[in-house]
Amino acid sequence: MTREDMRLLLHIAEWTVQNHRHVRSTIRELAGTEENYLIIARELDRVNAHIVRARSLHAEATLTLVEWLVIVDSYQWKCAYCQEKPFEVMHHRIPLHEGGTTPSNCLPVCRGCCTRRKKNPPEPHGSHLNHSGSATRL
């Protein structure tokens, strides 16, 4: 790698950090409350992490933050399987490497159901997906 290439990479890295901070500060302003900011920041990080993971496996990666929030809200922020506990993880109905991170493949699930789901797959409560496979607001 040349010095010029290294300078360019450092410049891009610096730009990324600065813009990331700008995006986060804008989200904080728009959220209105610290609680709303923490929720949106957590879910943004969750979606981004799953998108990166799906891409690294060469799987489909189309889920957006808006789609994820609609899905979570359609289950009242509770586990899609037991509907008793708050959701804790983004669960893939079809294994990530096969089904990707898409609106039709992602569900909000508690850790207990996620663990049990791997052994004996239950069906989620209610169908919150339209025929095109994307989430709809209830």
Stretches found by the model and what they are:
Residues 53-54:
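Intrinsically disordered, low-complexity regulatory regions
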Residues 80-108, 121:
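Histidine-centered nuclease catalytic patch
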Residues 1-4, 127-138:
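Short intrinsically disordered terminal tails
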Residues 37, 41, 60, 71, ...:
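Residue-level marker of regulatory loop/turn positions in helix-turn-helix DNA-binding domains and
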Residues 45, 72-76, 102-106:
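Short metal-coordination and nucleic-acid-contact micro-motifs, chiefly zinc-binding Cys/His arrays
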Residues 1-50, 105:
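BZIP DNA-binding basic region
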Residues 106-131:
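Short Cys/His-centered divalent metal-binding micro-motifs
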Residues 59-89, 110:
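Short cysteine-rich loop/turn motifs with clustered Cys
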